Amino acid sequence: MEKKKHGTNSISEALKVKAAVEQETATPEPTPQSETESADKIKQLEEALAAKEAEAAANWDKVLRERADLENYRKRVQKEKEELLKYGNESLILEILPAIDNMERALEHACDESMSAIVEGIKMTLCMLQSTLKKFGVAPVDAGKGTTFDPAYHQAMNQVESSEHEPNTIVSEFQKGYLLNERLLRPALVSVATAPKEQ
């Protein structure tokens, strides 16, 4: 008889546990008020998510712009550095050019045989200076007789009527012009031919 009582207790306990589990897992019947609260909560969360997504997109755009600005800055600094290396000695070269001009004039006017040693020394010095300048990218402007006058490289000191030369060509050069790495350092001072006036 005791066995029977023990079996009945087990069954009743099992039924109680089952009822408790069903009660815990059963979904409560939604009420209209809880549905409205849930919809409002979902709407708030969606709005917050949209705001955060917009903020993230704006931040990403800002990062991309900053990265582009930094890259442009690097390129500009690199270009300025290259220009500084290329043209940094411009003022020094401009100071040396008059000495070269004077040596060239001295050679043009040297005609005395007794000065041949001095003339030879000047030629050697001039040659060394020109060679050194060439190493640093200095080249003379082409301003020989018959060359077409180019205001980008030549400065006209006067105009000469000439039937022997084409109009707008160089007749003579007063002072050499120079380029530094293909950029004008000093224009050539020249005399330019014009067509003779008809009488």
Swiss-Prot record:
GO biological process: protein folding
Function recorded in the entry: Participates actively in the response to hyperosmotic and heat shock by preventing the aggregation of stress-denatured proteins, in association with DnaK and GrpE. It is the nucleotide exchange factor for DnaK and may function as a thermosensor. Unfolded proteins bind initially to DnaJ; upon interaction with the DnaJ-bound protein, DnaK hydrolyzes its bound ATP, resulting in the formation of a stable complex. GrpE releases ADP from DnaK; ATP binding to DnaK triggers the release of the substrate protein, thus completing the reaction cycle.
Keywords of the record: Chaperone, Cytoplasm, Stress response
Alphabetical list of HAMAP family matching this protein: GrpE
Region span, Disordered: 1-40
Oligomer and partners: Homodimer.
Gene expressing this chain: grpE
Cellular compartments annotated: Cytoplasm
Pfam families recorded: GrpE
GO CC aspect terms: cytosol
Bias (Polar residues): 24-36
Record organism: Geotalea uraniireducens (strain Rf4)
Protein name per the record: Protein GrpE
